[in-house]
Amino acid sequence: MRVTGKGSGRVSIAGLVCLKPGQRPRLIYRTRVFRGRKHEPKGFAEPDYIALLDRAHQRLGGNLVLVWDRLNTHLSAPMRRRIAARSWLTVFLLPTYAPDLNPVEGVWSVLKRSLADLAKRTIDQLAAIIKSRLDRMQYRPELITSLVAKTGLDLRPP
């Protein structure tokens, strides 16, 4: 999400839609604000994604099966090494450019629609609103379930 005008910047978001049999679906996310400062990271790198996965593992417990898009950071050699070091993590990749199969893309779509009519704000105000909207989504399991259902993927355990 970008903000234009004085004090512009960007809010980057990385998220996971998590399903565990017998539990409500979960949305786990991280945000990063970029204010345009020199040497400030503009987005997420491998360590950030791994920290998100580690957090999901800690919150959910047990092994994780990750169905991931083909973002270049997700496919990099450093990321593959980090994933290989986690015996509890199995990764399956979605086909190239398949946002319709990724429930997280549905989360971003719902979020963006909810932000469409906002007046211009500062980047910090925008970041706070984004976190608030994502926090609300975390407590709407029916929404997360519907976003998974829209993908058409059968994610039930065998």
Regions found by a protein language model. Give the residues of each.
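Short functional hotspots at interaction and active-site rims
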Residues: M1-P158
